[in-house]
Structure formats: structure tokens, C-alpha cells
Design a protein with these regions (language model features):
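Short, solvent-exposed mixed-charge patches
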Residues: 138-139
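Acidic, glycine-rich flexible loop segments
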Residues: 77-131
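An ectodomain-focused feature that recognizes extracytoplasmic/extracellular
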Residues: 3-81
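N-terminal hydrophobic targeting segments
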Residues: 1-2, 116
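Short, flexible coil/linker segments at or flanking structured domains
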Residues: 2, 7, 26, 31, ...
Length: 139
């Protein structure tokens, strides 16, 4: 498990550009699109080299079934971009991501913003999520 110092719990908000979609295997205008609302992200670096990262967006104090979006991936050498390998839109429902990236912004080692997008499919259905998250600076 990651050292406790490698987990950051960041309060903030998802911007209006955050949403999830659900539809057929090919993205289409008829896909069901839902605004994604969050006020918190938990960023966990799973290894000492800070290469394996998990970002989980959701509502602080949210119920088990409240909307969430999780992205699990590997940081690129630039230290700011992650290639997403797995994603989930419900707890314990990890799925391989067809494609996905997260771009992180840091102040020192603290995450101040994150933009993630990824999609996954199961059978003939496709889910996608795009999250644009900005931290609230400490006053």
C-alpha cells in the first residue's frame, strides 16, 4: 500500500465541463449525457516512484451510491500526464479503459487541478467520463 503521505484529499469543484455519457459502442449525439458534480478528489500514488496513480472524484461525505468517477493509470515521464488503464463510475466496478488520460497540475507536490477523460465498454454499451477539476486555494 502507498505511504499515507502519497494520498491527497483535495477539496474543490468540478467545473461545468464535467459530464458522463452512456450509449452505444460508437459515440453519437443521442448518447445520454449527464452533468457530473463533485467537490472532492482523492489522489493516491500507489508506489514510491509516484508512477501508479488513482484519482477518485466525488462528493465529500457522499453516499455509497452517489455519483463518482475513478481513473487508474500510469504517470508519463513528464510527471503531469497519466495514461488511464482502468476506470469506474461506481464503487467496486473497475473496468478496462478503452482510452483515457489525466492531466495533473501541481503546486510543489500538491495537486491543484486535474482534467481526466476516458471511456469503457461492456457488451454493446459505452460509458465515457470527462472531469475538469480545480482546487480551492487555501485562504
Amino acid at each position: 500500500p502507498a505511504a499515507a503521505s502519497d494520498t491527497q484529499n483535495v477539496s474543490a469543484g468540478c467545473t461545468q465541463r464535467s459530464y458522463t455519457t452512456y450509449g452505444g459502442l460508437k459515440a453519437a449525439p443521442s448518447d445520454q449525457r449527464t452533468a457530473f458534480i463533485c467537490d472532492n478528489v482523492v489522489v493516491t500514488f500507489q508506489d514510491a516512484k509516484r508512477q501508479h496513480v488513482v484519482l477518485e472524484f466525488g462528493l465529500r461525505g457522499g453516499k455509497k451510491d452517489s455519483p463518482m468517477a475513478g481513473f487508474d493509470g500510469t504517470m508519463d515521464k513528464d510527471g503531469m500526464t497519466a495514461k488511464i488503464h482502468q476506470m469506474y463510475l461506481a464503487r467496486d466496478a473497475l473496468n478496462p479503459a478503452d482510452d483515457g488520460t489525466c492531466h495533473l497540475t501541481f503546486a510543489g507536490r500538491a495537486v491543484t487541478a486535474a482534467q481526466c477523460s476516458a471511456s469503457m465498454h461492456q457488451g454493446k454499451n459505452r460509458w465515457a467520463a470527462a472531469v475538469d477539476f480545480k482546487a480551492i486555494p487555501d485562504r
